């Protein structure tokens, strides 16, 4: 794939981004390059249905951290689509919103992890999703591709060719680990952009209060 960006290809990267880190950014840039995407739109989730029983940091904080993390890349944008929407954040609703905005000619590419793709049959209105957009499944070195291939026959026939694999560098970074490190006064430098690190510290995010409740989310 050359450096020339094909018009009419837009990437969508959803996630809680609690907090956003270099793993997210590397994945988005790898997908943009490999699939010649015009841009990648980061969509912090509002109320993710798969995490309804887990505490998630206030959406405005996560949105601001995502803005800070993506500011240096002119091909990255951040959308308030899900955090301003009432109710649970379903991917099919987000894709429909971008389809209305960009029209029928633009190809939409939803970027996610390969592990998430393995659960795609449980997603709301999966048939509609696979008609409206392509999926880029980011794998790590050592990921067992046969797991994905075994699930492909269960997908709607017209959607099987819309799932693409891309291998990204093995960055052992997770939002869960970053939250744990902040809580336990461990360093998080080089795990996420410096501006995000400073935002976390200045807002007191991920630190427990004396009553055991996490400060601000």
Curated annotation (Swiss-Prot):
Put simply, this protein is called Probable nicotinate-nucleotide adenylyltransferase
Q: Which UniProt keywords apply?
A: ATP-binding, NAD, Nucleotide-binding, Nucleotidyltransferase, Pyridine nucleotide biosynthesis, Transferase
Catalytic activity field = nicotinate beta-D-ribonucleotide + ATP + H(+) = deamido-NAD(+) + diphosphate
Q: What class of enzyme is it?
A: transferase
Q: Which SUPFAM superfamilies match?
A: Nucleotidylyl transferase
Q: What is its EC number?
A: 2.7.7.18
According to the UniProt entry, its GO molecular function terms are: ATP binding; nicotinate-nucleotide adenylyltransferase activity
Q: Which organism is it from?
A: Moorella thermoacetica (strain ATCC 39073 / JCM 9320)
Q: Name the HAMAP family for this protein.
A: NaMN_adenylyltr (MF_00244)
- Pathway this chain belongs to: Cofactor biosynthesis; NAD(+) biosynthesis; deamido-NAD(+) from nicotinate D-ribonucleotide: step 1/1
Q: What does this protein do?
A: Catalyzes the reversible adenylation of nicotinate mononucleotide (NaMN) to nicotinic acid adenine dinucleotide (NaAD).
For this chain, the family text in UniProt reads:
Belongs to the NadD family.
Lineage, top-rank taxon, reads Bacteria
